[in-house]
Swiss-Prot record:
Organism: Mus musculus (Mouse)
Statement: the UniProt record of this protein carries the keyword DNA repair: yes
A single Gene Ontology CC term: chromosome, telomeric region
Any one GO BP annotation for this protein: DNA repair
PANTHER family membership: EP300-INTERACTING INHIBITOR OF DIFFERENTIATION 3 (PTHR16140:SF1), NON-STRUCTURAL MAINTENANCE OF CHROMOSOMES ELEMENT 4 (PTHR16140)
Protein name stated in the entry: EP300-interacting inhibitor of differentiation 3
Length: 375
């Protein structure tokens, strides 16, 4: 009765674990499908916006004369959209065939990885790289599950069986000799066993030759190294002339922080001066941060302006042409730190390549930087 009860409880526990694992797999698969649908929806909205911008009332519109750099950007955007679509399709296909990939010995996972490697050659932006990382996480999980199901079928070493085979090999049988251990046997039988084993083993082993010293053994004591006179003369010469190398000082992190704060305050003063001079006119974000003569200085300006936006001294939004602009904020809202809902904050990432910087300078016709160098 107790055995039946234990078997019933064990079966219930196994069924419970199976139900929990299936529920967890269903939730994970549902979350992945929702993420893919959300990304496809955002992609469709982007395509609809571009389609509405390109449409016009003229039934036979003439092709607009676009700048070659802008035309290259449009082609690059279409290429990136195609890569994202292929990544999503690849992820969806692997998720649908998850059980077949794990339970069978097919090369579907390897083919999917090769396809992802081909797609990764055309990746140049963050969104495509994020999809590639998502696929790699999925592929690594599938590879881990396949590795767990491997069956090596290795034969473990059995010492008892080995002893029986060894005794049969040398021609010794326990049944014929009527003894169970070597202590019960005669000394002649034991010596003959080890003698035959020795003869067989020596034929499979190579003996290393002895080492003969040609000039005798090495000396135990190491000879003292003679000092080099050249280094001593050079050191005396440096001490006499007084030209000593500069010592490396410890890096001061606070000094770098103070430099950053001073630069942010200087750029904030320039921005506030512009707002006081033109209170009703927002300033273009690109015209404010872009330095037409230095790409590195442009990146530094974007970095410093981000602190101004974070602290609430200015805000950034899109105008009618979907271009970013800078506007002043209400000072009373910034000073009131107790009210956390006084203004809404959003966080974003700006990616700017060297080619994008050149295109912005030529498109906006920026000839002079609004933020002058302080050095």
């Amino acid at each position: 009765m107790s055995k039946e009860k234990c078997s019933l409880t064990g079966g219930k526990e196994k069924r419970g674990e199976l139900v929990r694992s299936l529920a967890w797999q269903h939730l994970v698969k549902q979350e992945e499908e929702e993420a893919v649908k959300k990304e496809e929806k955002e992609e469709g909205e982007d395509e609809e916006e571009e389609g509405s911008d390109s449409s016009s009332d003229d039934p036979n519109p003439e092709p607009p004369c676009m700048h070659p750099d802008l035309l290259e950007l449009v082609v690059d955007r279409e290429k990136c959209r195609k890569i994202r679509r292929q990544y999503r399709q690849l992820i969806y296909t692997v998720q649908q065939n998850r059980e077949d990939i794990v339970n069978t010995a097919s090369d579907t996972l390897s083919e999917a990885l090769e396809e992802a490697n081909v797609l990764f050659d055309g990746v140049s932006r963050t969104r495509e790289a994020a999809l590639d990382a998502q696929f790699l996480v999925l592929a690594s999980d599938l590879g881990k599950e396949k590795a767990k199901q491997l069956n090596t079928d290795m034969n473990f070493f059995n010492p008892i069986a080995f002893c029986d085979l060894l005794l049969l090999f040398v021609g010794f049988n326990w049944v014929e000799e009527e003894c169970k251990e070597f202590s019960d046997c005669d000394d002649s039988i034991v010596l003959s066993f080890w003698g035959m084993l020795h003869e067989e083993a020596t034929s499979w082993m190579l003996q290393a030759e002895t080492f003969h010293f040609i000039f005798g053994s090495f000396k135990a004591e190491r000879s003292a190294r003679k000092p080099r006179l050249g280094c001593h003369k050079r050191a005396c010469k440096m001490e006499g002339s007084g030209d000593m190398p500069t010592k490396l000082r410890r890096l001061d992190v606070h000094a770098n922080q103070e430099t950053t704060e001073k630069e942010v305050e200087r750029i904030l003063g320039l921005l506030q001066t512009y707002f006081q001079k033109y209170p009703d006119t927002p300033v273009s974000y690109f015209e404010f941060v872009i330095d037409p003569n230095s790409f590195s200085r442009t990146v530094e300006n974007i970095f410093y302006v981000s602190f101004i936006i974070r602290d609430g001294f200015a805000r950034i939004r899109l105008d009618q042409d979907r271009l970013p602009i800078l506007e002043p904020t209400n000072v009373s809202q910034v000073d009131d730190e107790s009210d956390s809902y006084s203004y809404c904050r959003k966080q974003g990432v700006i990616s700017l390549s060297l080619q994008d910087w050149k295109n912005i300078v030529s498109t906006f016709e920026i000839s002079e930087a609004m933020i002058k160098n302080s050095y």
